[in-house]
């Protein structure tokens, strides 16, 4: 016989591995090689702490089994390469490799990444019968771009495609189930995977655009991690122009996206250079103005004592005051705050010193790169903020006070105000270079050309727009292009002072303060309205308004549309214009500033030279030239390292069987009319709308006025949780997770099956067998079994409550010689809130109508069943009361619900009669679960049932029988059959009958 340990044994190793690997077709075999390494020892021949004695080398061999996707073997013999466009060598090579392994495609902007993705999607659409192909892009405009490109290249039927954005979840489950090719943002795919709408096992191809975003816990990373838990047999293609800024960043992207191969090309690559449009780069070194150098020198003199103190404390490296770097100061301050070993006083002193150096570094950066106007706005705001707080004793930073109250700063402020009061003053030499470049460019190319100017700061963008508009003619039409966030408001000295000023204790002072606040608020509102009116009168008014309130998607779309149409021919953009938007063809790019990020620099320069030759102008001042050259050199080094296989790749499933080697068939794809219409559309929203209509199988109709309709709530499908294969998905009770054993006669253990499982027997009180239910039917039926002389003809119907529900009372039972009394109604309509009955102890006087009369009057009940309260506010109407009086039988009355009575009558607060008060008290005790009351009721009920059961003789209720009014005498002294032991058993139990 099997032992108990056999039944409680864990899973076998292979079964555990199967569950751990989620039953996917991927298997990993690890080989660990250990080698001894020399270590340092002390004089006692003990290994020093921290020394590793063994070197471990882990080698993982990954293999894949057959795919779970249903393949079309007739189509596997070849793959289609569209020849609708020029066949390029690098695209041909990348497509072939991307079909059989997960690939990161990093080629310059405008070199056809979308064509590569479309070709891969087309072939997996052909090779599989039901699997899903998903193209993800981070923004709506990019999604619309890819729809146009893919459908215009591949010719995939529009009825098999779907566009899923985050605006609506309507019919999402049906769309995922019925379509095969999807265009969506990664957030939509992630949410639908988590909601159980999309089955990760159905995905066979996933394309990720702008793949350099797949870092940290981004949506791209989360999507791939989720799919990997259930599916290892899918193809992933990642597209980007710049994978990362350094080797560690590239490795992170490779790990997050399960990349097996990187196909990287540069503008100088041999197989790509012949397809590149010419991009002429012009680097211009802009010297600093004398006014700027003077201000830099004065700032250095003011901050030198603080800088010297920081150098002596060892918290900042030694340098010239004009070379203070804000980023380095911020890094040092973060290190100090995170160091728990530094005493609090010293820590915060050092922090305030570095904070001041950070502010001065920001001032110097704005002054050197953007000019005096941008510098002065920041400088004045910081000075006003600190001096106001210091004067109000809200700041005690003496180190900062030494700088901000320095007399040199007052001189700087006066100089800047004098410079900026001149409308013809040029704050930086870069502005003059921008004007000269634009004038020369438009004279040669004409006003139909397009120009984009990139800058990092919003203040600088608005200054460039205003300067171009003031010095150029109507041939140059600039506009700002920024993000949605509102501009940061400067420090409001008046508001801060009033907020922290003494508020006063007297009521007059408080009222006066409130009136002043209302007046100031009205003045601010009036001033803002006047400023807005003045801005609207200027040609740059829309740019100024956008700089203050930000540009929402509608405004951005309108500006791009006007830029393509020619209403504006110069866009001054912040980082929002670097990627993710279809701005159109641009002939000239001017980089007003530069960054140390090669990704940003490459994205900026990639905006031109796509379909025709372009020009790039790089404006450098201060050390910007060094930063740019170093960033580009680092990126070139990174590309060389990637080409030398310095990345740790991950093996991916081939999906197609190893014995099948598809051949390339170059084919001219025929595009149907619907796809051709999408390919010709320019507006993003129009493309999305048309694709959505095609997805839903509707004909595209002109837009109509939106009318709100009442939503019809649809039956929601239950949420689906995706589970690994071969697991139980239902709830498993704890008892089924263990094996139960019994000791048999021979002393051995015997396994108990579910059928043999002994159940615990419940203690049954025999005395309660006949008292278990309180209904009159069961009471009467039990009586029928004891005396067969009970007639079957006498059925009494009693109307219950407002619902008019009728119960068939089998018989009315009374003792021989006994008569019934009745309660007399008090017909006092003047005082309806008095007690309903006069005789509290009375019973109905006579039963004058037989059963036939009762049945004949049932239609009266149906008419009156809705009338429970008459016009005089009585509990029952007169007819209802008469009906009840004539048909009342004591044994046929039971309470089924616990009403919530009030303590007084309805009309006025007159107490109820004694009997009604007792009933109210009874129900209150029942509602509050009064144990004493429950025991008393059980005791009384036992006595009553025992008396009824011992009755030997019963009489029939004859049609003509009459009972005397006052002749009922209940013999409460009748003996009952319950023994004392049975009664104690009942009353001592928890039974509540």
UniProtKB/Swiss-Prot annotation:
It catalyses: ATP + H2O = ADP + phosphate + H(+). The keyword DNA-binding applies. The keyword tRNA-binding does not apply. ATP binds at residues 107-114. Residues 94-261 form the Helicase ATP-binding domain. SUPFAM superfamilies: P-loop containing nucleoside triphosphate hydrolases. Residues 507-655 form the Helicase C-terminal domain. Keywords: ATP-binding, DNA damage, DNA repair, DNA-binding, Helicase, Hydrolase, Nucleotide-binding, Nucleus, Phosphoprotein. It holds the Pfam family ResIII. GO terms for molecular function: 3'-5' DNA helicase activity; ATP binding; ATP hydrolysis activity; DNA/RNA helicase activity; flap-structured DNA binding; four-way junction DNA binding; four-way junction helicase activity. Disruption phenotype: Causes transiant accumulation of ectopic joint molecules (JMs). Leads to a defect in donor preference during mating-type switching. Does not affect FKH1's overlapping role with FKH2 of regulation of the expression of the CLB2 cluster of genes during the G2/M phase of the mitotic cell cycle. One of its GO terms (cellular component) is nucleus. It is found in: Nucleus. Residues 530-551 are annotated as: Disordered. Changing residue 786 to A: Reduces the interaction with FKH1. PROSITE patterns: HELICASE_ATP_BIND_1 (PS51192), HELICASE_CTER (PS51194). Its EC number is 3.6.4.12. Residues 751-810 are annotated as: FKH1-binding region. Changing residue 782 to A: Reduces the interaction with FKH1. The modification Phosphothreonine is found at residues 776, 785. Phosphorylation at both Thr-776 and Thr-785 is required for the interaction with FKH1. It is an enzyme of class 3 (hydrolase). ATP-dependent DNA helicase involved in DNA damage repair by homologous recombination and in genome maintenance. Capable of unwinding D-loops. Plays a role in limiting crossover recombinants during mitotic DNA double-strand break (DSB) repair. Prevents crossovers between ectopic sequences by removing substrates for MUS81-MMS4 or RAD1-RAD10 cleavage. Component of a FANCM-MHF complex which promotes gene conversion at blocked replication forks, probably by reversal of the stalled fork. Interacts with the MHF histone-fold complex composed of MHF1 and MHF2 to form the FANCM-MHF complex. Interacts with FHK1. This is ATP-dependent DNA helicase MPH1. It comes from Saccharomyces cerevisiae (strain ATCC 204508 / S288c).
């Amino acid at each position: 016989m099997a032992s108990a340990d056999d039944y409680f044994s864990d899973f076998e190793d292979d079964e555990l591995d199967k569950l751990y690997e989620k039953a996917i077709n991927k298997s990993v075999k690890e080989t660990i090689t250990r080698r001894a390494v020399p270590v340092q020892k002390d004089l006692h021949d003990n290994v020093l702490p921290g020394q590793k004695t063994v070197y471990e080398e882990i080698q993982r061999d990954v293999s894949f089994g057959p795919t779970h996707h249903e393949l079309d073997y007739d189509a596997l013999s070849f793959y289609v390469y569209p020849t609708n466009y020029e066949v390029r060598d690098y695209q041909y090579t990348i497509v072939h490799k991307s079909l059989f392994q997960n690939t990161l495609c990093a080629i310059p902007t405008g070199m056809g990444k979308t064509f590569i993705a479309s070709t891969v999607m087309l072939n997996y659409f052909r090779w599989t019968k039901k699997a899903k192909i998903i193209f993800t892009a981070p923004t709506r405009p990019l999604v619309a771009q890819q729809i146009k490109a893919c459908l215009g290249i591949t010719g995939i039927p529009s009825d098999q495609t779907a566009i899923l954005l985050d605006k609506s979840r309507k019919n999402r489950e049906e769309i995922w189930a019925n379509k095969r090719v999807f265009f969506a943002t990664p957030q939509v795919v992630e949410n639908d995977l988590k909601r159980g709408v999309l089955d990760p096992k159905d995905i066979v191809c996933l394309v990720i655009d702008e793949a350099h975003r797949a870092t940290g816990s981004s949506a791209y990373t989360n999507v791939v991690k989720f799919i990997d838990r259930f599916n290892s047999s899918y193809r992933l293609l990642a597209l980007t122009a710049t994978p990362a800024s350094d080797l560690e960043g590239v490795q992170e992207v490779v790990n997050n996206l399960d990349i097996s191969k990187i196909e990287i090309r540069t503008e100088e690559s041999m197989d790509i250079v012949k397809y590149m449009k010419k991009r002429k780069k012009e680097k211009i070194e802009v010297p600093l103005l004398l006014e700027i150098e003077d201000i830099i020198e004065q700032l250095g003199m003011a901050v030198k004592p603080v800088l010297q103190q920081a150098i002596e404390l060892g918290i900042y490296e030694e340098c010239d005051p004009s070379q203070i770097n804000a980023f380095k100061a911020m890094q040092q301050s973060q290190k100090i705050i995170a160091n728990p070993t530094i005493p609090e006083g010293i820590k915060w002193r050092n922090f305030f010193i570095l904070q001041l150096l950070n502010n001065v570094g920001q001032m110097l950066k704005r002054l050197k790169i953007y000019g005096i106007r941008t510098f002065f706005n920041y400088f004045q705001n910081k000075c006003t903020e600190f001096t106001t707080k210091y004067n109000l004793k809200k700041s005690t930073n003496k180190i900062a006070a030494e700088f901000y109250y320095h007399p040199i700063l007052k001189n700087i402020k006066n100089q800047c105000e004098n410079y900026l009061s001149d409308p013809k003053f040029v704050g930086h030499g870069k502005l003059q270079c921008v004007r000269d470049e634009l004038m020369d460019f438009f004279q040669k190319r004409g006003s139909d050309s397009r120009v984009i100017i990139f800058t990092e700061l919003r203040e600088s963008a608005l200054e460039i727009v205003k300067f171009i508009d003031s010095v150029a003619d109507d041939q140059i039409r600039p506009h700002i292009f920024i993000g949605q966030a509102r501009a940061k408001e400067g420090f409001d000295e008046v508001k801060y002072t009033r907020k922290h000023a003494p508020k006063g204790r007297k009521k007059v002072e408080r009222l006066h303060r409130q009136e002043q606040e209302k007046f100031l608020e009205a003045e601010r509102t009036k001033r803002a309205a006047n400023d807005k009116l003045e801005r609207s009168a200027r040609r740059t008014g829309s740019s100024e308004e956008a700089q203050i309130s930000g540009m929402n998607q509608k405004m951005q779309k309108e500006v791009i549309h006007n830029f393509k149409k020619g209403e504006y021919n110069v866009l001054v953009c912040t980082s929002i214009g670097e990627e993710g938007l279809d701005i159109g063809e641009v002939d000239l790019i001017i980089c007003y500033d530069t960054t140390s990020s090669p990704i940003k620099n490459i994205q900026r320069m990639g905006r031109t030279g796509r379909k025709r030759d372009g020009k790039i102008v790089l404006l450098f001042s201060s050390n910007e030239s060094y930063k740019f050259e170093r960033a580009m050199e680092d990126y070139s080094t990174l590309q060389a390292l990637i080409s030398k296989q310095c990345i740790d790749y991950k093996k991916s499933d081939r999906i197609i069987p190893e014995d099948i080697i598809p051949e390339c068939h170059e084919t001219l794809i025929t595009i149907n009319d619907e796809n051709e219409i999408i390919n010709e559309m320019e507006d993003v929203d129009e493309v999305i709308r048309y694709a959505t209509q095609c997805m839903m199988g509707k004909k595209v109709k002109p837009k109509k006025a939106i009318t709100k309709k009442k939503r019809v709530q649809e039956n929601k499908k239950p949420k689906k949780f995706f589970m690994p294969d071969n697991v139980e998905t239902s709830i498993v009770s704890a008892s089924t997770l263990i094996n139960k054993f019994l000791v048999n006669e021979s002393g051995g253990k015997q396994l108990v099956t579910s059928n043999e499982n002994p159940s615990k027997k419940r203690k049954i009180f025999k005395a309660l067998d006949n008292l278990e239910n309180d209904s009159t039917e069961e009471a009467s039926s039990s009586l029928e079994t004891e005396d067969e002389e009970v007639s079957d003809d006498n059925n009494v119907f009693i109307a219950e409550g407002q619902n008019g529900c009728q119960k068939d009372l089998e018989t009315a039972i009374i003792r021989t010689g006994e008569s019934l009394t009745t309660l007399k109604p008090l017909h006092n309509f003047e005082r309806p809130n008095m007690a309903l009955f006069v005789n509290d102890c009375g019973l109905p006087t006579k039963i004058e109508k037989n059963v036939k009369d009762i049945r004949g009057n049932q239609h009266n009940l149906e008419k009156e069943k809705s009338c429970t309260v008459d016009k005089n506010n009585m509990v029952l109407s007169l007819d209802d009361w008469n009906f009840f009086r004539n048909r009342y039988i004591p044994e046929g009355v039971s309470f089924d619900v616990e009403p919530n009575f009030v303590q007084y009558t309805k009309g006025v607060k007159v107490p109820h009669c004694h009997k009604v008060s007792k009933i109210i008290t009874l129900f209150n005790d029942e509602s509050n679960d009064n144990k004493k009351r429950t025991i008393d009721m059980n005791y009384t009920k036992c006595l009553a049932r025992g008396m009824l059961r011992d009755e030997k003789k019963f009489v029939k209720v004859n049609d003509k029988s009459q009972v005397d009014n006052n002749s009922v005498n209940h013999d409460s002294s009748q003996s009952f059959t319950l023994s004392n032991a049975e009664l104690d058993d009942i009353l001592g139990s928890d039974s509540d009958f």
